[in-house]
Design a protein with these regions (language model features):
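Hydrophobic/aromatic-rich core segments of domains that either
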Residues: 113, 128, 160-249
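Intrinsically disordered, low-complexity N-terminal segments that are enriched in acidic
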Residues: 1-79
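Secondary-structure boundary elements
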Residues: 74-156, 164, 172, 233-235, ...
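A structural signal for short, well-ordered beta-strand segments
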Residues: 53-55, 202, 257-259
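Beta-strand-rich, non-transmembrane domain signature
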Residues: 1-33, 237-247, 267-286
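Generic beta-strand structural signal
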Residues: 47-51, 124, 200
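Short intrinsically disordered coil segments
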Residues: 15-17, 66-76, 216-221, 244-246, ...
């Protein structure tokens, strides 16, 4: 899964996938979440495998101020509509055991006592608190920490932080999904981490705005600088690269991953106004 998803806020202008050695068979499919998956088969022996994906896309950023929530969902708690709930249930379902209710208690700390809790304020506070109170530590081993382990260690990768926030908001009744993709980091001085590798964050379903991005690693609300590649209910369903091989265990020496996200030359790729950006006017009418 390396091909970015097509959507109103990101449109593919060009995409190329190079695999060396050349596979004997290459086919594409959409998985159950609509992610683009390339399946490559090989019929010859090789000492190495290189997969290179190059993409140019048009990105329409959405900021926190452009997230508009339906009136009934602006305060927490709320209940999803009867039309949406059947399709959201699996995204609300908890994935990790929490016998001591550590995740539950941590999530509940963001709910105001004795006053109204705004939905966006709650989710924003949770995302920004992870960026502020937890330490980002790169880890190249596969898999994620459990949310409880991340809470206790107060450190982890972008995947760990995403899983923690997903489990926490699900404990509050929100529908949430795991996102794998890339983050645009033009300057390290801007404090954005997760560049140079695949990145992970969260999508939460909010009535009135649909699936909204929350990046707890960087405290980003909205899709600014975030390029979606795969969306799934669980991280294991959104692996960028997976497969099987035949050989001696000692033959596998490791894997290197490099991601480079840069701004395209506007002269070669002029804006098409395809990206849909939310806007609001003071006075408007329609029939």
């Amino acid at each position: 899964m390396m091909r970015p998803r097509e959507a109103f806020d990101q449109r593919l202008l060009s995409a190329r996938l190079d695999i060396h050695p050349h596979p004997s068979e290459l086919r594409w499919l959409h998985d159950v979440f609509g992610n683009s998956v390339a399946i490559a088969l090989f019929d010859k022996r090789t000492s190495h495998l290189t997969v290179t994906s190059e993409t140019v896309l048009e990105h329409a950023p959405l900021s926190q101020g452009q997230v508009d929530v339906e009136a009934y969902a602006r305060l927490f708690p709320f209940t999803y509509s009867s039309e949406d709930m059947p399709d959201l249930l699996r995204s609300i379902e908890r994935q990790h055991h929490d016998p001591e209710r550590l995740v539950d208690n941590w999530a509940r700390a963001f709910v105001r006592n004795g006053g109204d809790t705004e939905t966006i304020a709650l989710l924003t506070a949770m995302a920004t608190s992870i960026k502020r109170d937890f330490t980002y530590v790169p880890r190249h081993e596969k898999g994620t920490q459990s949310p409880i382990e991340t809470l206790k260690k107060r450190q982890g990768t972008c995947r760990d932080f995403a899983v923690l926030m997903i489990e926490a908001v699900r404990a509050l009744g929100f529908a949430a999904r795991f996102v794998s993709g890339y983050v645009y980091n033009p300057s390290r001085s801007e404090g954005v981490v997760g560049g140079g590798n695949t990145h992970a964050w969260v999508r939460i379903f909010l009535p009135g705005s649909g699936w909204v991005e929350f990046d707890p690693t960087n405290g980003i609300i909205g899709n600014r600088g975030l390029i979606r590649v795969a969306v799934a209910r669980d991280p294991v369903q959104a692996l960028p690269l997976s497969g099987t091989w035949f050989g001696r265990p000692a033959s596998f020496l490791g894997m290197d991953v490099t991601v480079d996200v840069s701004r395209a030359d506007p002269a070669r790729f002029p804006r098409s106004n395809h990206g849909a950006i939310n806007s609001r006017s003071a006075g408007s009418s329609g029939k």
